[in-house]
């Protein structure tokens, strides 16, 4: 029998706030962070995005880093979230602690600046995904193990899953796991070429949904065994009771029509936890607001829950789709929902579509949530689901 995985710290930064307190206020107030770009210079400035309302220099100042230092925005966002998580958990980097971060964009905000330059540039080799995680680790003086997960939009969820496995195997005592992603022209242009970006605020699970809004941010959680946390005298803020990953390999970018991968991921998470579908109090859906994803995810949820679907919402209309960081940002949102007793609203929803789930458009407060599912589905059908529980249940 594996030890229960306790969550003892959480940190977040996104378009709806820096830290858990700002994030909570925005969620309760139904205040979206999706809007016009302020910091990213792009030919597609008409596309609404969930941009963190701090420039690179403001982020550096907040962290006490030298002005003008060359640090990818992905790294800066990650440091902010990791710092909050580690401070809450009361830990520092040690030989028995690991840092796992998910990113796909990495340092492209810096690298893309040099593509138009003639001749060779050393910058091409300096800002890959792994170096961004190394930069986060360096800020805290290093960890015993540092690694990067890059599975597109399921990256951060997979980072958390790997962290739990490392603890269960005895390889690490503490793991700081999550993801960080910044907006870049490379990022925006790539998704625009797929024709899945909406020129209006996204509408998850709505009949008129027409694509996603990209976002940026970072989310991290501190994982350790329940025994290790209690021996340190730390009260867990939640528990990771189950998780599952499945890859249906249906298409390079599209979700499978029948939602097979999503169904398997959620089923695996439930099986690991020993819970039944009826025990789930809320589902934080992947809910990108693309016609394809929302239909596929709906089929998977209907298959799993039947006619007793728990409250469902996508928080991407708040933050934008933060791609590789989405799984951990939304995991922190789930922890906030459990702790403060509310269901986040599914913003901008008005009309159901045939075969689609009906989300909680208004949100609810003063509710008790004991077990929630948090879905993150990536390109190539790499689908992951986390089952997060109230500690003590």
PLM segments and residue spans:
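Acyl-CoA/ACP chain-elongation machinery
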Residues: 38, 171-193, 198-209, 243-257, ...
